[in-house]
Amino acid sequence: MIAPPGGTDWRRLHPLTPLVRFGRLILAVALITVPYLESSRSPRGKFELFYPVLVWAALIGLGTIGAIVSWAVTRWRIEGADLRIESGFIRRQSVRIPLSRIQAVDIVAPLIARVLGLAEVRVVSAGRGGEHGRLAYLTAQEAPAVRARLLALAHGLSAETPEPPAVPLLHVDNGRLIAGLSMRAHVLVPLAVMVVAIVSAVIAPGPGVAALGSVLTIVVGAGVALVRAFNEDFDFSINEAGDGLRLDRGLLQRRHETIPFGRIQAVRLMQPLLWRPFGWWRLEVDVARQHAPRDGSDQGGGQQARTLVPVAPRAHVLWVLARVFPDAGIAPPAGAEPPARALLKAPLSYHYLAAWYGNRYVYARTGRVQQATVVVPLAKIQSLRLRQGPVQRWLRLATLDVDTAGRRWGASARCRDEAEVQRMLWELTERARLARHAPAPSAMATAVAPA
């Protein structure tokens, strides 16, 4: 087939794509069927096992045929100024992604795909409501080449332009990662409840044993969450390139993601209570329109796409913060604390509340058990909202919410003097307007990494 001017010929996905897509179902069927094999030793057991196995075999056969047909009718090419992907047998679908709208190109390699030497190329574009263009699957050697080609064309360069080099910023130690994840509240609280339940079962065997079963389910759930988080953030590394920050992570499913600097709406520095003796912090980013695909294939990526540093010492976190938001400091100046009467409204968190702003960023600090500081560039502010409940009105206090184009969270100046909030509302509105018309600072300035 002759390619159009500026385009390429139609290309298909790798022939082993159906095996990767249907491999999970085959494994699930195997795990369900194995327990029934024990009953097949008796003649009656063999008869009872025959029909379930037949049904599962039929489902696997139909699924395999469907996966093969889906692969056969899926093709893609670069057509002019668009990436075009056609798929579907009964319901034909043709997706066109303008190359100029591409914001990031990620590479995802699930376990089965990695074993077979395959990887998925996931194209994130603006204005698609969280949907991604997916090329699943290509060879592990072809995927980076396709990624480099798409990024070059998206930036108006020649298709043969190599991918810009990346500078290593930070690698998260896996030992510190598992220790930090284990000291989170959603892990320790179920374990503490489990200990109490065991003691209760020893003291009062009747009701205590009954409660132990329910608690055990909660503990297992916490363990699964811990293993999943470790699996997703294993061997976490951050690299910096001209197109943004590149994140490499994952144990079973390896992910190579890119977060463009321009899409970062806000950052949040967090420190759980039990991390404080070790000086560990966590850094998260809120990215505009960063959603998981509708088919759920992201494997938790909707949450992990906003994790920039899972756990690291304070100096390392501030180093990465400086690469994202240059000249952003998180030390509150004098007068950043709320008035003393705010202690009546927020007695537990009063000593951690603070809010301030400068020429480029607005800051808000909150927290009781877990400290959190949010940094929002003035140029990213979408709206400002003043909130004042009945208790706040009685105390002459108010809260100012700073909204961005992100989907996760924003900054909140809580329990401030109502006159101060009115002044902040006017000043931040004017500063945000000026910041949107000012040239953006470069995040690629030369710097020295912390020791």
Language model features by range: what are they?
Residues 1-451:
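N-terminal basic, Ser/Thr-rich segments that initiate or prime the first beta/alpha elements at protein or domain
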